Amino acid sequence: MIRLAIVMLALAVPASTVRAQEKFQNSPDARVLGDFKVRVEKYDQLRKKADDSAPPLKESKDAGKIKDAQQGLAERIGAARVGVKQGEIFTPEIAQVFRRLLRPEAKEKETRQALQEDKPEVASFKVNGPYPDKEPVTTMTPNVLQALPALPKDIEYRFIRKNLILRDARANLIIDYMTNAIP
């Protein structure tokens, strides 16, 4: 019985993801969301090139070595993205669509609770900068993830207060962000 439940859950997650992505393809916002996808994929390719140019990282449980490798990757990405500014991926048009997609999700109790977790003082952050150490890596609720376009591996959405962050988890780098993503 448990095995059946696990199989059903495994089958349901990809199906719901596929349905969510089909929703975007058939929406009036398909062009704008397609532009977002192209911008994210362009970043992903840049990161892969930066990653390929580094010596291979040997598997390690040493937090210092892992952090050094992460910082090295972030530095190579930063060098390839010199002069990048906020809004390169979340253009005004894309941000407008995302705010509309997030508006109903922000009203959900689960989303509100997740955003209230561990509210330390506001940390500063910037594009091409590290995700702030003082900020919790906020768990994204399933309803929010389903409302937004899927992302490539190791690129994730996060919230810092009302700001939606596009984070490179491998480099611990803020790729871009949009302010006041939720009301």
For the regions a language model picked out, list residue spans one by one:
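N-terminal secretory signal peptides that target proteins for export/translocation
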Residues: 1-2
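Bacterial N-terminal signal peptides
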Residues: 5-14
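A generic structural micro-environment signature
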Residues: 7, 42, 49-52, 56, ...
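Sec/Tat signal peptide C-region and signal peptidase I cleavage site
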Residues: 16-20
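N-terminal propeptides/low-complexity segments immediately following signal peptides
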Residues: 22-27
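Early exported N-terminus immediately downstream of N-terminal targeting peptides
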Residues: 29, 33-90
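Mid-length scaffold segments of soluble, non-membrane domains
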Residues: 70-140
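Amphipathic, charged alpha-helical segments and their helix-to-coil junctions
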Residues: 112-183
